[in-house]
Amino acid sequence: MSIFGRIKRLFLSPKSHEVALVLGGGGARGIAHIGAIEALEERGYVIHSVTGTSIGALVGGLWAAGKMKELKDIVLKLNKKEVLSLMDISIGLNHLMSGEKLLTVFDQLVGDRKIEDLPVNFCCSASDLVSGKETVFRRGSLKMAMRASISIPCFFKPVRFHRHIYVDGGVHNTLPLNRVARIKGDWLFAVNASAPDRRFAPAFVSKIRKHREGKFGKFLDSISFHN
């Protein structure tokens, strides 16, 4: 059977409807996670656990909290003016935006909900600048966990939370396959919205990356993450 035939059979005739879902990073491309979740649900799959990082943590967390419709409405209504309204410019040594407006939106959507109180198993990851390791949030404030996981270095202000300083989870683990909760007989679905493999990029793109990784990379290395 061809690969396309296998994929068709997978989606149309599932032997098990239980799914463990992993949503990776990818910036704005991660909005595709919304469509992936809808496609699974339309085909009768039941997502029993979801793990995400960066934009995947945002989409996965809001889905787990039952706020997918609200998230989709926000995305569909986004225009240039709406995007600019969320950009709270606050230039510092380590960031361009404070991220407080995003946190306000999260608060409006999920309030003080705890991860352990969600109806499905959810976790997300962030990168700890103090220990230099990946941190996985399985308990505690959902909105703070999501905010920490999407803190793109140099764009959003790092999050100080429980005596740690966090930035985007994708720094350590772009697609956290090793963090998702599994049950016997379930399907594992992973959605990778990150940039394509650079080996297949056009030659001029490779030249741009080489230049950026030289000078810009040294600039990033010189930045100290502190207030």
Model-derived regions: residue spans:
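A glycine- and small-aliphatic-rich helix-loop capping segment at beta-alpha/alpha-beta transitions
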Residues: 35-43, 65-70, 140-143
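Catalytic nucleophile loop
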Residues: 33, 46-64, 173
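Active-site glycine-rich loop that binds ribose-phosphate moieties when present
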Residues: 107, 144-158, 169-176
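Helix-rich "cap/lid" substructures immediately adjacent to catalytic or cofactor-binding pockets
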Residues: 1-50
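Non-catalytic peripheral regions of patatin-like phospholipases
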Residues: 2, 15-19, 68-105, 127-141, ...
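A short alpha-helix-loop-beta-strand transition element characteristic
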Residues: 83, 110-121
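Conserved small-residue
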Residues: 26, 36, 56, 124, ...
